[in-house]
């Protein structure tokens, strides 16, 4: 069982790494694409927003398809579709084709979270679930961290189209790995040794609507909080803080790598405490304070990279607890649907954020991008504290 669950975790984590590499492909090249494609930051924000609109529209229905058709089959199809989307813009590097590619990539992105978490929930023993979620999320954050140096490096050495080609090749390689290794789960109905009841796929979700709404709002705020830094901080630092592009890109890369290692630490923490709301609130409050320091104090490159690194570690720390909260709210056999619904919050934030942050950059309000990140972090802190208090006030189950 352990070897099969490890194989499952490896495959799902590789796919998650590629999905985040794809998410960050366009944002990583934001400093270069306006000149390369003769477009504004707002137009690029619209392209990123389109990706998220499509993902938001399809993620919940795709979650139902994941539970009905099989998570692994859907995951492999998503990897192929992502490969096609970035291959398209590599072949035809223009803004109209970028928009078309973002539609296809958004459709593929709508599969990843429902499929990944459905596979993990069915194939990982409960006692290892917190660490499994942290490894899976670490892989995604690692994909985000690899995007800036790879995409910017390839684009500067050759041309942006070859960065899109690299993204396409990564998707194809992940698909090939899944084909070669095969399925670690012999029975689609197997759920950690427990057979799902007949008709589980058609069972409606029983999670309270308010719980789903709060979790979706939390995902939205998390997307807005970290998205400002992940996708627009390099352009903001270069434009508004006179930071050289290599130094800004290094600071972002350290932020992303630190986020990934924060996830691993968060996995251990998630298995040792049930006070997930207080952990998240403390981490985001401290992260907001550090970003304020970045805005208000001129920092040399090393100090800037250190500050963003600590910020990244803190924001990564809460990810496994976030995933455990959603799994706890998911009825058995409906993990794909539940994660599909609440993960739309990422896409809602992904629609609002790029257009807002692109607008601020086009208006020369670069510091506004970082101030927005602070505001969304404070809002995230408030939401998780309110949710924690609500959970503590709920009566304990009888017996």
PLM segments and residue spans:
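Helix-to-loop junctions at the C-terminal end of transmembrane segments
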Residues: 58-70, 263-275, 361
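Cytoplasmic membrane-interface "Motif A"-like loop-to-helix N-cap segments
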Residues: 68-79, 272-284
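Extracytoplasmic gate region of multi-pass secondary transporters
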Residues: 26-27, 210-256, 260
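Cytoplasmic helix-loop-helix junction between adjacent transmembrane helices
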Residues: 101-140
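C-terminal transmembrane helical hairpin of 12-TM major facilitator-type secondary transporters
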Residues: 276-322
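Helix-loop-helix hairpin linking two adjacent transmembrane segments in secondary transporters
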Residues: 136-186
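Conserved MFS/SLC helix-loop-helix module at the cytosolic interface between two early adjacent transmembrane helices
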Residues: 57-93
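Residue-level signature of mid-helix packing/kink "hotspots" within the transmembrane helices
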Residues: 24, 52-60, 144-145, 256-260, ...
């Amino acid at each position: 069982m352990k070897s099969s669950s490890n194989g499952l975790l490896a495959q799902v984590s590789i796919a998650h790494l590629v999905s985040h590499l794809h998410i960050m492909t366009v944002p990583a090249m934001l400093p270069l694409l306006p000149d390369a494609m003769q477009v504004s930051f707002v137009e690029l924000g619209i392209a990123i927003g389109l990706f998220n609109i499509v993902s938001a529209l399809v993620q919940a229905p795709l979650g139902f398809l994941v539970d009905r058709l099989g998570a692994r089959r859907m995951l492999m199809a998503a990897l192929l579709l992502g490969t096609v989307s970035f291959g398209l813009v590599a072949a035809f590097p223009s803004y109209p084709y970028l928009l078309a590619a973002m539609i296809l990539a958004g459709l593929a992105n709508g599969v990843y979270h429902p499929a990944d978490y459905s596979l993990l929930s069915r194939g990982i023993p409960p006692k290892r679930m917190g660490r499994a979620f942290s490894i899976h999320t670490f892989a995604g954050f690692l994909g985000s961290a690899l995007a800036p140096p790879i995409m910017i490096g390839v684009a500067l050495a050759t041309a942006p189209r070859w960065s899109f080609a690299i993204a396409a090749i990564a998707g194809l390689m992940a698909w090939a790995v899944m084909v070669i290794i095969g399925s670690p789960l012999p029975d689609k109905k197997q759920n950690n040794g427990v057979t799902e009841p007949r008709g589980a796929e058609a069972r409606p979700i029983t999670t309270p609507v308010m719980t789903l709404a709060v979790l979706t709002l939390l995902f939205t705020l998390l997307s807005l909080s970290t998205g400002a830094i992940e996708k627009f901080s390099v352009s903001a630092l270069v434009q508004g803080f006179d930071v050289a592009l290599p130094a800004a890109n290094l600071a972002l890369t350290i932020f992303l790598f630190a986020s990934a290692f924060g996830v691993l630490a968060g996995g251990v923490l998630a298995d040792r405490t049930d006070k997930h709301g207080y952990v998240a609130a403390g981490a985001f409050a401290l992260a907001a304070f550090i970003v304020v320091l970045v805005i208000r104090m001129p920092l040399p490159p090393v100090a800037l990279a250190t500050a963003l690194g600590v910020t990244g570690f803190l924001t990564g720390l809460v990810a496994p607890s976030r995933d455990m909260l959603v799994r706890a709210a998911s009825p058995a056999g409906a993990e794909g649907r539940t994660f599909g619904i609440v993960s739309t919050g990422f896409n809602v934030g992904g629609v609002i954020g790029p257009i807002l942050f692109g607008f601020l950059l086009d208006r020369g309000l670069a510091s506004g991008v970082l101030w927005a990140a602070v505001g969304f972090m404070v809002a995230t802190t408030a939401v998780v504290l309110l949710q924690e208090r609500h959970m503590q006030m709920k009566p304990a189950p009888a017996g």
